[in-house]
Structures are given as C-alpha cells and as structure tokens.
C-alpha cells in the first residue's frame, strides 16, 4: 500500500481509534472483582459496568455514519475521541457504581462513533482499489487490543489500581484528538433526512427492555416499574415496525427481511451472540473468584482464547467452502456448548491445567462461528440494501452482547449466596450451575441455523464478503 505521508498519518489516527475501542472492550472484564471491592459492591453484580457501555454503543451506532456525512468525519472523529477520553477520566474518578455507569455511557457514545466513522474515513481518503489493504492496516491494532487487554488490565489492577485501566486512555486520547484536529481533512457528503423517529423508537425499545431484564436484581427497580419498562419497550418496537412499514427511508428498511439468509443470520446471530457474550464476562470472574487466580494471572490465562481466535481466521473460508454454511454453523454452535460445559467440569474437578486448552478451543470455535454468521447474514442482500443490512448487523451484535452479559449476571445472582469468598465451595457451585445454564442457551441457535438453505457458490460468496 503506497500512500502520501499525509494519508499514512490519517490511517494511523484511525488505527489508534480502533485500538482504543477494542482495548476497552477486554481490559475492563479482568478488573471487575477489584472494582467491586473498591466500590463496596458484589463482584457478581458488576455486569452493569459492561452492559452500560455496550448498550450505549448499540443505541448510538445507527446515527454515527449520518453524523459523519453531515458534520464531517474530522469533526465527529475528534468529538468521538474527546468523549471517549473524557468518559475514561470520569470512570477513573468514580467513587460509586452509579457514577461509574454514567461515565461508561459517556465513554460508550464516543466508542460508538470511533469505529464506523473510522471505516468511513478510510473509504474517503484511499482509492477504492487500495481500500482492503488500508482496512487491514487500520484494523491490525484492533486485533492487538483484545490480545493485550486482559493481561494489561490484570497487570494494572494487581500492581497499581483498577483506575489505571481508564487512565491509560488519557495520553492516547489526547494525542489522537490533537492529531485528528491538525492532520485529518473534514470530508462531508450530501445526506438525506435522518430518520429521527425510527432512531428514537429503536433506542427506547432497546434501552427499556435491557433495563427491565435485570433492573430488579441489579438496580432494585420495583416489579411494577419493571412491567412498565417492558410495556414501553414493546410499544416502542411495535411503533418502529409500523413506522418502517410505511417509510421507505426508515432507519432500517423492512425489505431486508425478505432475504431469507439475512433473516436467519440476524435472528440466529442475535441468539448466538447472547450466548457468546456471556463468556468474556464470565471467564475472568470464574478464574478470580472460582479458581482464586490473581488479576494478572487471570488476564494471562485469557491469551490462549485470543490466539485461538486469531489463528483460525486464516482457514475459515476453506472450512465453509468444504462443509457449507449450515453444517459449519450447527457444528460450531454445538461445539461451543460442549466447550462451555468443560468449564463446568473444570469448576467441579478443579482441573487448572485444563483451563488454557479450554480457552484456546473457545476462541477457535467462536471465531469460526462469528465469521460464518456475519458472511451468511450479508451475502445475499441486494446492493441497495447492503449498507443498511450491515448497520443493522453491527447494532444487533452490540445489543446481543449487552443482553448476554445481563443474562449471565442474572444467572450468577440467582445461584449465588449473599456473601461469597474466593475458592469457597459455594462459589464453585455458583459457577457450576451458571455454566450449565449457559450450555443450554448457547446450544439453542443450532435449531435456527439448521434452517439455513443448501449452499451454492460457497467459495465465491464467502471470499467476496468476508
């Protein structure tokens, strides 16, 4: 990839944004037990720290591309980095869980805009024939983030404090914001009117239903308010459906669901990612509270999972071409349920030596399923609907992760005692029952993926979309 120096600097700016966002998604998980102790909260009720961020990203994603086109990629990317950095500072200064959750929402608004606006920036600054090479360059730091995050988070918690997992964003964010302001051009595009009504209906529906899912246990919301939240959420989603039926310029066109593979991929992927979303949250908790590992040791133990994920991506295309979408999705879903069951066995038998092996296979199977799900969902969409389908898929991925973490927190709360100590028999029982429940949830999408139609032209389709 040969580019002028100015363009290379702009690509580096986007790459830094990708790195900040992906690092944050993994660095926090390892620190949750220490954060709980500092804030006088139960470590099994800290999932709201993850949910608040991921749900905010899901809600804000649909607006990010339109804002970038209307206001300019430089202005929005600059604002995104500032918001993310400000949110990080506020997270580090939080003294209560409520303060931390508000700060995570601010951080999530910035995080929601960084990655999609970064992609849009790359599209505008490089020729189309060099787009793939440029995206490979800017996403490489994003692949390093998940690898570095758990170990770095554990190291900072163990040898400094949990506040530093947020403070390390400050110098990177300040440098990134200054570089964006002085080096990035402010591309704009003529835009159609933004579907504000559809955006509000979807945002209200997602937020209220997610809050209702765990509001009683985590936030102490009374049952009558929970029922009200559920009613508001369902009414909001129904209102969006009615709105989109009569509006061709709706945020997400309902004609997307006329494509059979998109419908199966989106619904199956939503349920599948609910199950998968539980695992990155559960694993650091299990290693620290269930197995008695230090934060740094627990973070290092997560590395095999990332290595398994990165290693298998090179051969996913060949696997799908050989066996087809339906077989790969059904088999990988059931294999993931089996690997999750092995966590229950580890909790029961205390087989510490088995943990890196289980985590490696967890990362491998997850990567196969994710890549195949994403490709299946988008591969048959007509070109006019492809952009909207991709945006809806991105939003659904974040929403399902939020739901998965919420459900994992609910399961932990159901099975836990009021006070537990690391390495206690009660703790092992909590994780044993939680993992066994997760096995059922993770296996369920196999029923949906079994409806994938017979594969045709697998190689050309996957190679073009992956």
UniProtKB/Swiss-Prot annotation:
It is found in: Cell inner membrane. The keyword Oxidoreductase does not apply. GO terms for cellular component: plasma membrane. Belongs to the major facilitator superfamily. TCR/Tet family. This is Putative multidrug resistance protein MdtD. Pfam families: MFS_1. Gene3D superfamilies: MFS general substrate transporter like domains (1.20.1250.20), Multidrug resistance protein D (1.20.1720.10). SUPFAM superfamilies: MFS general substrate transporter. InterPro entries: EmrB-like, MFS, MFS_dom, MFS_trans_sf, Multi-R_MdtD. GO terms for molecular function: transmembrane transporter activity. The chain crosses the membrane at residues 11-31, 48-68, 71-91, 105-125, 137-157, 164-184, 194-214, 218-238, 262-282, 292-312, 328-347, 351-370, 402-422, 429-449. Keywords: Cell inner membrane, Cell membrane, Membrane, Transmembrane, Transmembrane helix, Transport. It is a multi-pass membrane protein. It comes from the Bacteria. Its main location: membrane. PANTHER family: BLR6921 PROTEIN, MAJOR FACILITATOR SUPERFAMILY MULTIDRUG TRANSPORTER MFSC.
């Amino acid at each position: 990839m040969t580019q002028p120096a100015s363009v290379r600097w702009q690509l580096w700016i986007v790459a830094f944004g990708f790195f900040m966002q992906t690092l944050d998604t993994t660095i926090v998980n390892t620190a949750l037990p220490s954060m709980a102790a500092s804030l006088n909260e139960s470590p099994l009720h800290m999932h709201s720290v993850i949910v608040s961020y991921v749900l905010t990203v899901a809600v804000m994603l649909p607006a990010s591309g339109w804002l970038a086109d209307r206001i300019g990629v430089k202005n929005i990317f600059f604002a995104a980095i500032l918001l993310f950095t400000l949110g990080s500072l506020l997270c580090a200064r939080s003294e209560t869980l409520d303060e931390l959750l508000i700060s995570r929402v601010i951080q999530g608004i910035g995080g929601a805009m960084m990655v999609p606006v970064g992609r849009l920036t790359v599209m505008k600054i490089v020729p189309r024939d060099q787009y793939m090479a440029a995206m490979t360059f800017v996403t490489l730091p994003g692949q390093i983030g998940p690898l570095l995050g758990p170990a770095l988070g554990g190291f900072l918690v163990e040898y400094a404090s949990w506040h530093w997992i947020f403070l390390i964003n400050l110098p990177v964010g300040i440098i990134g914001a200054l570089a964006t302001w002085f080096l990035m051009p402010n591309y704009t595009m003529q835009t159609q009117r933004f579907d504000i009504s559809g955006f509000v209906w979807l945002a209200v529906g997602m937020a209220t239903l997610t809050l209702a899912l765990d509001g009683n246990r985590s936030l102490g919301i009374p049952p009558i308010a929970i029922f009200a939240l559920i009613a508001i959420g369902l009414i909001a989603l129904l209102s969006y459906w009615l709105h989109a039926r009569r509006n061709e310029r709706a945020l997400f066109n309902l004609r997307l669901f006329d494509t059979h593979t998109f419908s199966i991929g989106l619904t199956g992927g939503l349920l599948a990612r609910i199950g998968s979303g539980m695992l990155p949250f559960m694993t650091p908790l299990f290693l620290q509270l269930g197995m008695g590992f230090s934060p740094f040791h627990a973070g290092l133990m997560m590395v095999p999972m990332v290595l398994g994920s990165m290693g298998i991506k090179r051969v996913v295309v060949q696997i799908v071409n050989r066996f087809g979408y339906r077989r790969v999705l059904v088999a990988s879903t059931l294999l993931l349920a089996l690997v999750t069951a092995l966590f229950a066995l580890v909790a029961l038998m205390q087989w510490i030596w088995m943990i890196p092996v289980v985590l490696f296979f967890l990362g491998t199977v997850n990567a196969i399923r994710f890549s195949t799900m994403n490709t299946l969902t988008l591969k048959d969409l007509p070109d006019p609907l492809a952009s909207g389908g991709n945006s809806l898929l991105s939003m659904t991925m974040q929403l399902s992760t939020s739901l998965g973490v919420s459900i994992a927190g609910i399961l932990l709360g159901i099975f836990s005692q009021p006070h537990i100590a690391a390495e206690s028999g009660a703790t092992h029982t909590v994780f044993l029952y939680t993992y066994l429940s997760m096995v059922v949830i993770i296996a369920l999408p196999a029923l949906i993926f079994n409806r994938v139609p017979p594969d045709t032209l697998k190689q050309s389709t996957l190679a073009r979309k992956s």
